[in-house]
A protein has these predicted regions:
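Residues that mark the start of a beta-strand
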Residues: 92-96, 263-265, 294
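Active-site donor-binding acidic/aromatic loop of nucleotide-activated sugar
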Residues: 151-153, 320-329, 347
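Donor-sugar nucleotide-binding helix/loop cap in glycosyltransferases
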Residues: 344, 358
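Alpha-helical solenoid repeat scaffolds of the TPR/TPR-like class and their adjacent stem/linker regions
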Residues: 1-259, 271, 281, 310-315, ...
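A conserved nucleotide-sugar
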Residues: 122-124, 284-314, 319-320
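A short structural motif in glycosyltransferase catalytic domains
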Residues: 346-348, 367
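Short hydrophobic "strand-cap" motifs at the C-terminus of beta-strands
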Residues: 98, 269-270, 298, 325
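A short alpha->beta transition loop at the rim of the catalytic pocket in nucleotide-sugar-dependent
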Residues: 341, 362-363
Length: 368
């Protein structure tokens, strides 16, 4: 707020402010701020990053325009390196996966087995990592699951693109899109003849140097293709998963988490910025209609807990029916799902890995 008061025209600052408020569930002036935001976007002003926009407005045309404004400012197509048409036919197709998340992270929780199960008679698999070298169990598994692991944390966009060219990648797959630690600039320099956006970010990148976005008919209905700069490569289901993941042995009791023994338990473990006032209104109405029910949600900030407690009371619901779950290690996090009866999804930014986790643990998911 202070930064906005000092320099309201600073690029993308309004969006950063709104995203922070969404993380804290501060909704007091949200409707007016969203009206201001969409007006500025329609005037081609640089006000918000595409990732932050996903949770705010369910309008694919505005989403695309947001991406185009952002990427033209931050990652315009580079002509430092000429575009690659194609390489002479290799014996094996060379695929490079690019990510900041080759570690314990939701993206790797979904994709770890993907790297392992490529047919090595037909494919050569490279990983280009620009995230922390954590050496945790997931990081080591992915290193072992690919043919070549390239640590490019200290390399520039151009040097990384040159490395990809030197190993003659046929296909470069961006697993992050506009999420945290994104390096879209690598793709702006044409790392490979074919460039694909997949799984980490399901909005359009808004530029012509991404050839395809992998999706399914639920994520992107055919009538919505016009809102994407990429061609849509449809799979029966876009989301890969890890079939080797075992169910946790940990057993929680309701008492461990502070849940009444006889209550029907709704839950949502999505990040707080995905919760909108409209979504919270729906949750309040559901609680009203199910006597003795409670809502278990993941919140990691005390200020967010205070704000959501205020919001539930404003909707006429006893604050004790809102129960906050803390961040837990993966086995305990999964085990906690066993305490719930129904997962309530957020809108417009739905659950991804969290929905898969719920289903894995036998918990039904109600989405929209």
């Amino acid at each position: 707020e202070r930064a906005l008061a000092l320099n309201p025209e600073l690029s993308f600052l309004l969006g950063q402010s709104l995203h922070t408020k969404m993380t804290l569930c501060l909704w007091d002036n949200l409707s007016n701020e969203l009206n201001e935001l969409t007006k500025k976007i329609n005037n081609n002003e640089k006000v918000i990053e595409p990732f932050s926009m996903l949770a705010l407005i369910d309008d694919p045309e505005i989403q695309r325009k947001t991406a185009e404004i952002f990427t033209n400012e931050k990652y315009p197509q580079s002509h430092v390196l000429s575009k690659i048409e194609r390489y002479p036919k290799h014996k094996k197709i060379r695929i490079g996966y690019f990510s900041a998340d080759f570690r314990v992270h939701p993206v790797s929780a979904l994709t770890a087995e993907l790297y392992e199960v490529h047919d090595r008679n037909q494919f050569e698999i490279h990983a280009f990592s620009y995230g922390p070298d954590t050496k945790d169990e997931m990081n080591l598994r992915i290193k072992a699951g690919v043919d070549h692991f390239h640590d490019v944390r200290t390399m520039s966009y151009e040097d990384t693109a040159m490395l990809a060219r030197s190993v003659e990648l046929d296909i470069a797959v961006d697993l992050g899109g506009y999420t945290q630690l994104a390096r879209t600039g690598i793709f702006a320099m044409s790392a490979a003849p074919i460039q694909i956006s997949y799984i980490g970010y399901l909005g359009t990148m808004g530029v012509n140097y991404y050839d395809y976005l992998v999706a399914d008919q639920i994520i992107i209905p055919e009538e919505n293709q016009k809102y994407y700069s990429e061609k849509i490569a449809y799979l029966p289901s876009y989301q890969v998963n890890d079939s080797t993941q075992s169910l946790p042995e940990t057993i929680f009791t309701r008492q461990d988490v502070g849940i009444p023994e006889a209550a029907f338990v709704f839950c949502c473990f999505n990040n707080a910025y995905k919760i909108t006032p409209t979504t919270f209104d729906s949750w309040g109405r559901i609680l009203e209609q199910v006597d003795g029910s409670v809502l278990l949600i993941y919140v990691n900030k005390e200020s967010t807990k205070i704000n959501l407690t205020k919001e539930i009371v404003l909707r006429g619901i006893d604050a004790n029916r809102l129960i906050f779950g803390e961040r837990l290690p993966k086995p305990e996090y999964l085990a906690r799902y066993r305490l719930a009866d129904l997962f309530l999804d957020t809108h417009p930014y739905n659950a991804g890995t969290t929905a898969s986790d719920a289903l894995r643990m036998g918990l039904p998911v109600l989405t929209c």
